[in-house]
């Protein structure tokens, strides 16, 4: 009985285990072109649902105030698209003297050059109770920015260049991010009183969508023949990726919690996730365009295929810890405020 109660309370963590297990048993169900059609249901419907859900749940004034938080936007975008790839490049200079496959290392560099994802950072920020409005803006803005910046970074660090279909990617992002968010805000204006009275489970909806994303991502990972590497290389790359993620999460936490940073605990949560997450849905198509016909494309893609599920899993596992820190920090701020 107590076990069932615990499982109900931790339903999301149980859901992650079930999703990964189901993906391992029958990955063909959730791969692109499979029965679930994730190229439509995830890339379009799931992402649109997340941002429509956010549009419904967020107060308009919260979105407006997030737009003018320039310091936060600059921090996230500079960290993601400048510091991250540069730091990875320096790290790879050390790893280049090891026996690790050079194309896997180049794949790690491509991870550093990728834009942030449009969904996972938003969902995790919402799950913690952080600054969701800031996460939405930076995920969307970073994705749009990455369409232009990422090919330039790949050219700079790897010497690879190709024409990217900016128009089609821009239109997909606009239709799945901007339009649902605006529609959600418009609908909210008409049912605001009902929303505040009933308090629908927006967090549960977002978390359920994330479970679907986790499931289809692992279906792709388990069914991908390109990940047929020796176990040592896979374990080593996985260890490096998790170490990089944890190090950068810690780094963003340290920078954003300094006394003179000007960031609230809720801002810090958005910064941690938005600064360290990288997009698979934008990343893989970009790699296929930029490295079209390259004989080592499969190896170059492996680190990103591992990084994406790893960031979702790591973020999901850390949600209770980060939430506990944020709540205690917010209580501390309230207690130290002078009473009038």
Curated annotation (Swiss-Prot):
Subcellular location: Cell membrane; Endoplasmic reticulum membrane; Golgi apparatus membrane
Tissue expression profile of the protein: Expressed in heart, brain, colon, lung, liver, adrenal gland, stomach and ovary. Also expressed weakly in small intestine. Expressed in skeletal tissues.
Gene name per UniProt: Slc10a7
Keywords assigned by UniProt, alphabetized: Cell membrane, Endoplasmic reticulum, Golgi apparatus, Ion transport, Membrane, Sodium, Sodium transport, Symport, Transmembrane, Transmembrane helix, Transport
Membrane topology term: Multi-pass membrane protein
Protein name, per record: Sodium/bile acid cotransporter 7
GO CC annotation: endoplasmic reticulum; endoplasmic reticulum membrane; Golgi membrane; plasma membrane
Any single GO BP term: heparin proteoglycan biosynthetic process
Function: Involved in teeth and skeletal development. Has an essential role in the biosynthesis and trafficking of glycosaminoglycans and glycoproteins to produce a proper functioning extracellular matrix. Required for extracellular matrix mineralization. Also involved in the regulation of cellular calcium homeostasis. Does not show transport activity towards bile acids or steroid sulfates (including taurocholate, cholate, chenodeoxycholate, estrone-3-sulfate, dehydroepiandrosterone sulfate (DHEAS) and pregnenolone sulfate).
Ranges of the Cytoplasmic topological domain: 1-10, 59-71, 138, 185-201, 256-270, 320-340
Segments crossing the lipid bilayer: 11-31, 38-58, 72-92, 117-137, 139-159, 164-184, 202-222, 235-255, 271-291, 299-319
One protein family per Pfam: SBF_like
Chief site of localization: membrane
Domain of life: Eukaryota
Species of provenance: Mus musculus (Mouse)
């Amino acid at each position: 009985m107590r076990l069932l109660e615990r499982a109900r309370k931790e339903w999301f963590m149980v859901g992650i285990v079930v999703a990964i297990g189901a993906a391992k048993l029958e990955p063909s169900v959730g791969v692109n072109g499979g029965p679930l059609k994730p190229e439509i249901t995830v890339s379009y419907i799931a992402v649109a649902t997340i941002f429509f859900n956010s549009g419904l749940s967020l107060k308009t004034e919260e979105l407006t105030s997030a737009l003018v938080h320039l310091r936060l936007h600059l921090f996230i975008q500079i960290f993601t698209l400048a510091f991250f790839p540069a730091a990875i490049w320096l790290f790879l200079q050390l790893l280049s003297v090891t026996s690790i496959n050079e194309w896997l290392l180049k794949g790690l560099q491509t991870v550093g050059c990728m834009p942030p994802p449009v969904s996972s950072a938003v969902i995790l920020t919402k799950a913690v109770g952080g600054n969701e409005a800031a996460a939405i803006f930076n995920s969307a803005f970073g994705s749009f920015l990455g369409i232009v910046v990422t090919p330039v970074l790949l050219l700079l660090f790897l010497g690879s260049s190709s024409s990217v279909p900016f128009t089609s990617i821009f239109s997909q992002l606009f239709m799945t991010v901007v339009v649902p968010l605006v529609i959600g805000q418009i609908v909210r204006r008409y049912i605001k009183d009902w929303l505040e009275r009933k308090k629908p489970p927006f967090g549960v909806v977002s978390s359920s969508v994330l479970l679907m994303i986790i499931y289809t991502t692992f279906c792709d990972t388990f069914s991908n023949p390109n990940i047929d590497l020796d176990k040592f290389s896979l374990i080593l790359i996985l260890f490096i990726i998790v170490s990089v993620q944890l190090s950068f999460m810690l780094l963003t936490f340290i920078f954003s919690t300094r006394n003179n940073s000007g960031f609230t605990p809720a801002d810090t949560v958005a910064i941690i996730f938005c600064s360290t997450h990288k997009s698979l849905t934008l990343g893989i198509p970009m790699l296929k365009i930029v490295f079209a016909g390259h004989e080592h494309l499969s190896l170059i893609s492996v680190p990103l295929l591992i990084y994406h599920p790893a960031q979702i899993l790591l973020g999901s596992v850390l949600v209770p810890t980060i939430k506990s820190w944020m709540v205690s920090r917010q209580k501390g701020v309230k207690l130290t405020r002078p009473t009038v």
